């Protein structure tokens, strides 16, 4: 059990918790900066029961593996690759949020508001849903950084499936809001989530 307190355990778990704290805090701060404190609730922290359970399971996997298979956690090139994924996913997501400005919300809007505009510049020139792509990269990266093979696969599948269902739902409303303009945009720019058109 002392393996958890080894240099490896300390480094990887510290990086994991710092990544989680930074991600959620920055999401909340950006929401306040863009929309104003009066329009932002704690839901902008993006912490749900399912998410918390997934993170708990990943930590339990980490503890079990570092105790019974400590060598599994010593693959630094894998861990560093995961850390790189976390950073790149974070940059992509935050760039998407800042670029979209007031048009970005954590909840899918089903009614068009006055300030809504179709954002097609910046990172939106290369993908329609860069914030989703960024979160997918970030979330899988947390598990790759921990050298958690089971959770890395599970996170990839679950997060991908979530976005595979969310994107068509969201785009239904985007087509209503922006009509032909959005249809043409969607035809020439990929979603940013693999295998989701």
UniProtKB/Swiss-Prot annotation:
Induction: Not induced by abscisic acid or auxin. It comes from the Eukaryota. It is a multi-pass membrane protein. Inhibited by farnesylthioacetic acid (FTAA) and N-acetyl-S-trans, trans-farnesyl-l-cysteine (AFC). S-adenosyl-L-methionine binds at residues 116-119, 124, 129-132, 170. GO terms for molecular function: protein C-terminal S-isoprenylcysteine carboxyl O-methyltransferase activity. Disruption phenotype: Plants lacking ICMTA and ICMTB have altered phyllotaxis, fasciated stems and development of axillary flowers. Substrate binds at residue 166. It is found in: Endoplasmic reticulum membrane. The keyword Transmembrane helix applies. The keyword Transcription does not apply. Expressed in flowers, stems, leaves, roots and siliques. Detected in apices and vascular tissues of leaves and roots, in the stigma and in the filaments and anthers of stamen. Not found in petioles or hypocotyls. Pfam families: ICMT. Its main location: endoplasmic reticulum. The chain crosses the membrane at residues 16-36, 52-72, 81-101, 140-160. Belongs to the class VI-like SAM-binding methyltransferase superfamily. Isoprenylcysteine carboxyl methyltransferase family. ICMTB is more widely expressed and has a higher catalytic activity than ICMTA. Catalyzes the post-translational methylation of isoprenylated C-terminal cysteine residues, resulting in the modulation of the function of prenylated proteins. Involved in negative regulation of abscisic acid signaling. Carboxyl methylation is a reversible and potentially regulated step in the post-translational modification of prenylated proteins. This is Protein-S-isoprenylcysteine O-methyltransferase B. The lineage of its organism: Eukaryota, Viridiplantae, Streptophyta, Embryophyta, Tracheophyta. The gene is ICMTB.
């Amino acid at each position: 059990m002392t393996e958890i307190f080894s240099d490896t355990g300390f480094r990887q778990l510290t990086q994991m918790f710092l990544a989680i704290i930074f991600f959620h805090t920055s999401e909340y701060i950006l929401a306040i900066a863009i929309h104003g404190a009066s329009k932002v609730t704690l839901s902008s922290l993006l912490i749900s029961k399912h998410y918390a359970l997934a993170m708990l399971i990943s930590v339990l996997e980490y503890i079990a593996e570092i105790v019974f298979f400590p060598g599994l956690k010593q693959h630094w090139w894998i861990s560093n690759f995961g850390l790189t994924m976390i950073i790149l996913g974070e940059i992509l997501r935050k760039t998407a949020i800042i670029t979209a400005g007031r048009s970005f919300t954590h909840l899918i809007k089903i009614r068009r508001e006055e300030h809504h505009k179709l954002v097609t510049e910046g990172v939106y020139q290369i993908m329609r849903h860069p914030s989703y792509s960024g979160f997918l990269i970030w979330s899988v990266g947390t598990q790759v950084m921990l050298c958690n093979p089971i959770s890395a696969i599970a996170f990839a599948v679950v997060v991908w499936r979530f976005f595979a269902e969310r994107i068509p739902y969201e785009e239904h409303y985007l087509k209503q809001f922006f009509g032909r303009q959005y249809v043409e945009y969607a035809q020439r720019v990929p979603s940013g989530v693999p295998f989701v058109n």
